[in-house]
Amino acid sequence: MTIHKKGQAHWEGDIKRGKGTVSTESGVLNQQPYGFNTRFEGEKGTNPEELIGAAHAACFSMALSLMLGEAGFTPTSIDTTADVSLDKVDAGFAITKIALKSEVAVPGIDASTFDGIIQKAKAGCPVSQVLKAEITLDYQLKS
C-alpha cells in the first residue's frame, strides 16, 4: 500500500525580492508566506528548513512511539526538536546536519533497552531515510 501526501509551493519573482507561499493537502498550512527574507533575514513566515525540521521531529516521535509500543512500552510524552543546519557550500547551500533532541518519558523502561529502541527509531523514521544530511540524535529519558 502506497500513501501519497502532497505539499505545494507557489513562487513569484527573483530570489531576493520574490515571494511565495506553501500549502499542504490537509490545509494545515494554507498559503503560508516564505521567501529570501523569511529564510535568511528572520522575517515572519516559514522556510524549507523549518518545515523539514518539523516533519522530521514529528516522524521521529511517531516512529519512536511505534517501536516502544512494539516492545511493550507506552510513552507518556515525547518532545522532539530537529535543528536543521543550512550551510554555504561551494556555489550554493546545503542542509549539512539535522540534530534531533528528544525528551521522552516512558514508565518502566531501563536505559539500555531505551537506547536500543531510540537508535532504531532514528534509523527507521521514513524522513530520516530520505535525507542525505548527517542526522544526529541527543535525547533525555525523563523519569
From Swiss-Prot:
It holds the Pfam family OsmC. InterPro entries: KH_dom-like_a/b, OsmC/Ohr_fam, OsmC/Ohrsf, OsmC_Ohr_Peroxiredoxin, Peroxiredoxin_OsmC. Keywords: Acetylation, Antioxidant, Cytoplasm, Oxidoreductase, Peroxidase. One of its GO terms (cellular component) is cytosol. The keyword Cell membrane does not apply. It is an enzyme of class 1 (oxidoreductase). Preferentially metabolizes organic hydroperoxides over inorganic hydrogen peroxide. Belongs to the OsmC/Ohr family. This is Peroxiredoxin OsmC.
